Amino acid sequence: MLRLPENSRPVVRPTEGGLIMQYVDPHIHMVSRVTDDYKRMALAGCVLVSEPAFWAGFDRSGPEGFRDYFRQLTQFERKRAAGYGIEHRCWLCINAKEAENVSLSRQVIAMIPEFLDDPGVLGIGEIGLNKNTRNEATVFLEHLDLAARRQELVLVHTPHLADKYQGTRMILDMIHDESRISPERVCIDHVEEHTIRLALHAGHWVGMTLYPVTKCTPARAADMIEMCGPERIMANSAGDWGHSDPLAVPELIFEMRRRGHDDALIRKVVFDNPLSFFGQCPRFRFTLRSGASSRE
């Protein structure tokens, strides 16, 4: 077993039989990242990113702002990623922070079907709760209804910090009550030690978000994989305009290798699992440029 020195990143020069492992970042907000990040991610082994619709850092003034945003996700960002050999997919919704405005949310939800037939769209997300309010729950349920009617995959945002456990329970209960959506077609994101088993036991996929300060570190993510096993578990950077690291997934690869885990297990979490989850979307097509592996 090859062991890497402590406190170092994985080598970033792709070589035959070397340390680079191809990976997928299933949750990253590239519209808020500089183009140089695409290059760094490609050098580190990233071959595919999945970008959920999210908060811009401020509340948008009206529904047309979301139409422009959805065009950015489905058109411009895909081209920017392709320039560095990275495939780009996206999810559409109005985020939980703006869901307090139910009237605006309904206008945005009514707009989403215009974009759902785009081959780069994976489904509805990231929907969920922020402060666990009644309005947020109303908008979450209406997103679920759209997903059920259109048979779309769902990516769910769970609340931060003190609101996480209660919000996760509320989310799981609402999904359970929506009998038209199979649990394996939903990913519960931003899980931590006190919520991961709840989501897995409900039959959902889960995402671990690797943040420098909040949510989950690579070491804690490795602990959770050791605790729960690799089935239906994914890891992401959720990189955005805040304090985040677009190379967080390679940091997890390094941590897992440092602990002596087999590359096949690591690859399952950072590559195979995202492709399996995305593969439930009939629009999803992905082929590695190297021809080493594909998902049709």
Where are the model-predicted features located?
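Histidine/acidic-residue-rich catalytic or RNA/ligand-binding cores of hydrolases
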Residues: 34-36, 164-173, 196-201, 216-225, ...
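Short acidic/histidine-rich active-site segments
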Residues: 230-246, 266
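Mid-to-C-terminal alpha-helical segments outside catalytic/metal-binding sites
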Residues: 2-17, 250-296
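Short hydrophobic/aromatic-enriched beta-strand-loop microsegments
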Residues: 48-51, 205-212, 286-287
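Short helix-capping segments at alpha-helix termini
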Residues: 82-84, 177-182, 228-229, 258-264
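Short, acidic/turn-prone active-site loops that include or flank metal/cofactor-
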Residues: 53-57, 210-215, 239-240
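Active-site glycine- and acidic-residue-rich loops that bind
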Residues: 98-103, 209-218
